[in-house]
Amino acid sequence: MNNNTRRRGPQRRKRRGPLRLIMTIIIAAAICLAIVALCIYFSGVRYIKIDTADGGFVKFFGVVTDLGEPTRGKIVYSNGVTAEVNLERESIIYSNGDTYAGELRNLIKEGQGKIIYANGDIYEGEFLGDSIHGHGKYSYVTGDVYEGDLVYGKKDGVGTYTWIDGSVYTGEWSDDKKHGRGIYTWADGSSYTGEYALEQKHGQGDYTYANGDKYSGSFTNDTREGRGTYTWINGEIYEGDFKSNTINGSGKYTWPSGRTYEGTFENGVIVRNEET
C-alpha cells in the first residue's frame, strides 16, 4: 500500500501544473481586456444606439465629447446601410457612395443640407427625420431640375420642374405627380394652364398649341372631353361638345366670314345642315 501511495503523489502534482497555466492565461486575458476597455473608454470611444421616429434605429461607434455627444465614427442604420460620420464637419459618407454635408440631429439628417448621390443626382434643401422634407432643389443627372416643396422625398405641394429640353411645369404636386392647378409649357411652344389629376390634364383648362390654335374647356384623362371652345389660328371657332379629343355632339361653328352652323356633329363632321 505504501508503494501505491508513493506512485500517486507525483501524478497529482503533475495534473496541477496545466490547470494553473490555464487559470493564469484566463486571468491574464481578462486583465488585458479590462485594460483595452479602459483605454477605449478614456480615449472617448463609445457605442450609442438611437431609436428613430419611423421605428428604426441608428447605431454609432466612435469618439464622443466629454458630454457624451458623438463627434466622429461609424454609423449603422436599421436598413443595413453603413456610413462614416464626422459631426464636427457635419458630413456623412455612406457605404453606397452617397455623401451628405449639412445639419444633423441625433446622427440623422435634419435641417439644411446637401446630398450628392452616387448616381450623380444632387439635392440641396431641407431635411426632416433623415428624409428629404420641406423646400429644396433636386438636380437630376439627366439635366432635369425640380425646385419646390417635397414631402418625405416626393414632390408634394407647389414646385417647378424643368426638363433638359426646356419644357417647364409650375404648379401643384401630390405624391410625386402633377395634381391640382398648374402651368405646363413645352419646348415646342405649346402650353397648358389648368387643372391636373394624377399627371393628366383633368378638369377645366386652356391649351395653346404650337401652331397657334387654342382650346378652352373641359379635359378628362388628358383628352378634350365635355364642353369647350376651340379657336383655329385662321379664325374659325367651335363652341360645344367634345368626346375623345374630337368634336362630337351639339355645338356651334363660326367661320371667319361670319357664317355659322349650330347643330349636331359626329367625329368632327356636320350631321344636320342648320347653317345661318
Task: List the model feature ranges, each with a label.
Residues 2-276:
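Glycine/tyrosine- and acidic-biased, solvent-exposed loop/turn segments at the edges of beta-strands
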